[in-house]
């Protein structure tokens, strides 16, 4: 923490001495566990099983993020959605696709670095928003800022901005690399099977 908290809320016996160590005021809450029938110690023993007890801001920080990466038409969206369904969790669609669909009829199809930065930031913000809804501790992401950086390089041939994109991105717990091991399908938004 950047500074000591002023208040500590707990339902644990160690709450008072813990708060004193930080020079904070302690508030004992629900000691008999009538409102929240689980202790912090029990939650920590099996975080995935008890993830639903966490407040949204804690879910955002503690959920495990699995990100799909790969070329166009490699099944990223299909796999992300199927994994979320199988794991009964949240999945994050690709913001860049929505953005592209929104601008696709412009006469001037040139892109700017600023657009890619906004796409990357929006993708990360969408991940953070949806992470707050996770109930089982896992967030499935169709893409992330790293993939946006690759598209930036493809469209603008600028290879020196990777660290700028990655500054938006918390590294995921797992990248799932989708390979082009089946036929490429044109869905109206894809550019090239190469």
Where are these regions (language model features)?
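The conserved Walker
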Residues: 72
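A basic- and aromatic-enriched beta-loop-alpha substructure that forms the phosphate/nucleotide-
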Residues: 1, 14-15, 137-154
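Nucleotidyltransferase catalytic core that binds NTPs
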Residues: 1-64
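Hydrophobic anchor at the beta1->P-loop junction of P-loop NTPases
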Residues: 68
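Conserved lysine of the Walker
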Residues: 76
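Hydrophobic positions on the alpha1 helix immediately C-terminal to the Walker A/P-loop
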Residues: 79, 83
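A glycine- and Lys/Arg-enriched "phosphate-lid" helix/loop adjacent to the NTP-binding pocket
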Residues: 43, 151, 155-194
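Conserved substrate/cofactor phosphate-moiety recognition/catalytic segment
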Residues: 85-128
């Amino acid at each position: 923490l950047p500074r000591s908290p002023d208040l500590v809320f707990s339902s644990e016996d160690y709450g008072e001495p813990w708060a004193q160590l930080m020079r904070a005021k302690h508030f004992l809450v629900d000691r008999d566990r009538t409102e929240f029938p689980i202790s912090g110690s029990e939650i920590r023993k099996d975080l995935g099983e008890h993830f639903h007890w966490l407040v949204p801001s804690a879910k955002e920080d503690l959920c495990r993020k699995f990100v799909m990466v790969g070329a166009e038409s490699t099944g990223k969206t299909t796999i992300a959605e199927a994994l979320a369904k199988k794991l009964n969790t949240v999945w994050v669609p690709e913001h860049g696709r929505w953005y592209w669909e929104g601008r696709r009829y412009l006469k001037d199809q040139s892109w700017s670095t600023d657009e890619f930065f906004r796409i990357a930031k929006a993708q990360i913000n969408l991940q953070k928003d949806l992470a707050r809804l996770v109930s089982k501790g896992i967030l499935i992401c169709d893409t992330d800022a790293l993939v946006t950086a690759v598209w930036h390089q493809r469209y603008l041939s600028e290879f020196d901005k990777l660290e700028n994109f990655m500054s938006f991105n918390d590294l995921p717990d797992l990248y799932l690399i989708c390979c082009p091991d089946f036929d490429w399908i044109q869905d109206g938004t894809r550019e090239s099977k190469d």
